[in-house]
């Protein structure tokens, strides 16, 4: 079983935690190609491309210009968005990190897919950014074939050949479903609000992180055991779930 997460905009590079080893991104060369393109953008151009404030555009201009010499950090440590904050890194041991390395994949606009111990540099490049290359109009077109093929090849080596989608729709769209050889289970967290079941964005993000932490700590590699998850009071609802979606409610 593999699970996918979305990369985060919030990044922290410090020495608060250590990992058992560091690996290079699978698509390092492709990421460097995109950085070469981005280094040609001015601050104003980046402000428009990334749809960010002037200060953030200036920050990321400096990041891209110094990309090759910048500090690096394992992706699982560097990302600190709402999902990644739920990973209890202070409790992780060597086996936890190595299990995550084998079972967790992070979808990234710059790197395609990352393993948790792949080292990354500071950057900002969301998946829906309309960065054009010679043969592609956007990042989806640039990455979808590469990422889909790689995930297919990786799952071929797993006993439980299932992809657990804990990423946002924006990022999971990178996978071409029609060319994916294995079942994809999307996980949804819903709760009753005003008589209707609704997904609450910030709580759903937190829940995706907590489920990921639970999977890593308990070394879950059997998709049928996912039904036992009960974080934040959620429980699996068989009547709302189907062959493509696992729904947890409270």
Curated annotation (Swiss-Prot):
Offer a single GO CC term for the protein: cytosol
Instruction: Please give the InterPro entries that the UniProt record associates with this protein.
Output: YaaA
The source's superkingdom equals Bacteria
User: Which family does this protein fall into?
Assistant: Belongs to the UPF0246 family.
Origin organism lineage: Bacteria, Bacillati, Cyanobacteriota, Cyanophyceae, Oscillatoriophycideae
Tell me a GO biological process for this protein. response to hydroperoxide
What is this protein called in UniProt?
Answer: UPF0246 protein cce_3295
